[in-house]
Amino acid sequence: MSMLSLHQLQLNIEKRNLFDLCITFLPSAITYIKGANGSGKSSLLRMIAGIMQPSSGNIYYKNSHINNCQKPYCTYIGHNLGIKLEMTVFENLKFWSEIYNSTETVQAAIHYFKLDYLLDKKCYNLSSGIQKVVAIARLIVCKSDLWLLDEVETNLSKENRDLLNNLIIMKANSGGIILLSSHQESVIKSAQILQLK
């Protein structure tokens, strides 16, 4: 089963314990991570993605410690969008599809987010909102059942926010686990809230 478990996961900064978490996320879970600035929302997502080490504790996905999971085991989109600005929109999507061995999904991502007219554009020529759309199109391109999304709705138009929310619901309905940090109110009624102090 594709469970995600945090076992006594702690983050200590300047002798302050930001969180101490013991929690399991089951398949089809959508969880909004809430908390004030500096409460550790982004750090928690980075830990689960394997980018940052916790102060103590362990993270397990599909019953394996994340250090032993075959990479890439998740799709993480943070403040650094992970797009290559000197490459075109199509080249970026193709690049990610090759990492995840999922080249057949590129056209689906292009169609879903209506990117056809931008395929040959270099990403440095795009607005911050469209760069964000290219980044979240990876959610279709990259075949993973664990999505970690750090304030991805920022700079998105209402249309693209709606497309993103529908995509999240579809992923959850197919058994995926989605964790999102957000300053906005949850518009997904089935979502649960993880509140960091």
Curated annotation (Swiss-Prot):
Record's subcellular location: Cell inner membrane
SUPFAM superfamilies: P-loop containing nucleoside triphosphate hydrolases (SSF52540)
One Gene Ontology term, aspect cellular component: plasma membrane
Domain ABC transporter intervals: 1-196
Topology class, membrane: Peripheral membrane protein
Catalytic activity: heme b(in) + ATP + H2O = heme b(out) + ADP + phosphate + H(+)
One MF term in the entry's GO annotations: ATP hydrolysis activity
UniProt entry keywords in alphabetical sequence: ATP-binding, Cell inner membrane, Cell membrane, Cytochrome c-type biogenesis, Membrane, Nucleotide-binding, Translocase, Transport
Superkingdom to which the source organism belongs: Bacteria
InterPro entries recorded: ABC_transporter-like_ATP-bd (IPR003439), ABC_transptr_haem_export_CcmA (IPR005895), P-loop_NTPase (IPR027417)
Positions that bind ATP: G35, A36, N37, G38, S39, G40, K41, S42
Subunit: The complex is composed of two ATP-binding proteins (CcmA) and two transmembrane proteins (CcmB).
NCBIfam families associated with the record: ccmA, PRK13541.1
Role according to the record: Part of the ABC transporter complex CcmAB involved in the biogenesis of c-type cytochromes; once thought to export heme, this seems not to be the case, but its exact role is uncertain. Responsible for energy coupling to the transport system.
PANTHER family, A to Z: ABC TRANSPORTER I FAMILY MEMBER 1
Family per similarity comment: Belongs to the ABC transporter superfamily. CcmA exporter (TC 3.A.1.107) family.
Name by which UniProt lists this protein: Cytochrome c biogenesis ATP-binding export protein CcmA
UniProt source species: Rickettsia typhi (strain ATCC VR-144 / Wilmington)
Lineage, opening ranks: Bacteria, Pseudomonadati, Pseudomonadota, Alphaproteobacteria, Rickettsiales
Gene that this polypeptide is encoded by: ccmA
